[in-house]
């Protein structure tokens, strides 16, 4: 018997990441090859953006995806999020020239407060929310705080791009296969302060830490490369990472919805005090997902170097949150 379609809302749907994302969702890559989807696509009310969205929808039609059960264009989150089962919040205010970080936080606080309130009012009570738009952790925190009637645990931020970037660097360094890496994680904020941690990781069943055995490379090459990869891509491409961000969003949602088969993945999730992270902060943790739920991997030893890195990314996140508290 065929499954009932689920509703997937995507914001910033006509943007670069949206364009790299929608066709993969419609083809079944995110929720499975047997799960029909209805796409509820949100763009800003601007005429140009809405016209671009219509063009994307024409292309989606022209793909004749068997799993695409319907699609809708919206300019208001109150209609775009109606009964939605999954919400990918991709659209955010990018940092413009001469813009201070505080201005960026304030502009995004406005967007994500409105979207959180709309989700709270009209979305499915079990909606799974992934925030992709930066600053992702803080935007997820804002949306979560604006949706008091929804479970806080259902608001997540994307750290999977950092996770995937770290995995690629490790595979290149060790000569191993990226698909054979397990127990890698990224702690903290989706920003250059993130801490990609391979102390527990294996590649082809062998310890990554032992294979690399180079703390100088870890601190001076690996972590800066992963942390500043987004900036390096903008420098090279003239545009920010879109296809790789969309790919990470698919990975994050697929594992959350369908399970990670016992493997560690990284998600930005609200802390309940694990590893000394204050409750409610949306922080990157190692998680295992099963039956639509994620569980933080607990009991890992945090050495002095790791604690220092975790403290640094936590301090940045607390600074961001303090910067938006008065707006919530």
UniProtKB/Swiss-Prot annotation:
Its EC number is 1.1.1.37. GO terms for biological process: malate metabolic process; tricarboxylic acid cycle. The active site is at residue 190. Keywords: NAD, Oxidoreductase, Tricarboxylic acid cycle. One of its GO terms (molecular function) is L-malate dehydrogenase (NAD+) activity. It catalyses: (S)-malate + NAD(+) = oxaloacetate + NADH + H(+). It is an enzyme of class 1 (oxidoreductase). Substrate binds at residues 95, 101, 134, 165. Pfam families: Ldh_1_C, Ldh_1_N. NCBIfam families: MalateDH-SF1, PRK05442.1. HAMAP family: Malate_dehydrog_2. PANTHER family: MALATE DEHYDROGENASE. Catalyzes the reversible oxidation of malate to oxaloacetate. Belongs to the LDH/MDH superfamily. MDH type 2 family. This is Malate dehydrogenase. It comes from Paracidovorax citrulli (strain AAC00-1) (Acidovorax citrulli). The gene is mdh.
């Amino acid at each position: 018997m065929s499954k009932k379609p689920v509703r997937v809302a995507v914001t910033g749907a006509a943007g670069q990441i949206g364009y790299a994302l929608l066709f993969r969702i419609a083809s079944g890559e995110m929720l499975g090859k047997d799960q029909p989807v209805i796409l509820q696509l949100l763009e800003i009310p601007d005429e140009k953006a809405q016209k671009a969205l219509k063009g994307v929808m024409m292309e989606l039609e022209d793909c004749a995806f068997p799993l695409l059960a319907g699609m809708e264009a919206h300019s208001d989150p109150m209609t775009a999020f109606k009964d939605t089962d999954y919400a990918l919040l991709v659209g955010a205010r990018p940092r413009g020239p001469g813009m201070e970080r505080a201005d960026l936080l304030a502009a995004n606080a406005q967007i994500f407060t409105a979207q959180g309130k709309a989700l709270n009012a009209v979305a499915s009570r079990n909606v799974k929310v992934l925030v992709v738009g930066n600053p992702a952790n803080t935007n997820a925190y804002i949306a979560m705080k604006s949706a008091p009637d929804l479970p806080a645990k259902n608001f997540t931020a994307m750290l999977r791009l950092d996770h995937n970037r770290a995995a690629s660097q490790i595979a290149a360094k060790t000569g191993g296969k990226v698909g054979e890496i397990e127990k890698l994680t990224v702690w903290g904020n989706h920003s250059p302060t993130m801490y990609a941690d391979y102390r527990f990781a294996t590649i082809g069943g062998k310890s990554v830490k032992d294979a690399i055995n180079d703390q100088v490379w870890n601190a001076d090459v690996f972590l800066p490369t992963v942390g500043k990869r987004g900036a390096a891509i903008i420098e090279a491409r003239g545009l920010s990472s879109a296809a790789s961000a969309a790919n990470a969003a698919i990975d994050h949602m697929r594992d959350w919805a369908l399970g990670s088969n016992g493997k560690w993945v990284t998600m930005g999730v609200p802390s309940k005090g694990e590893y000394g992270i204050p409750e409610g902060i949306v922080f990157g943790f190692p998680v295992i997902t099963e039956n639509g739920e994620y569980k933080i991997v607990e009991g890992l030893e945090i050495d002095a170097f790791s604690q220092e890195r975790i403290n640094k990314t936590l301090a940045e996140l607390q600074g961001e949150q303090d910067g938006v508290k008065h707006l919530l």
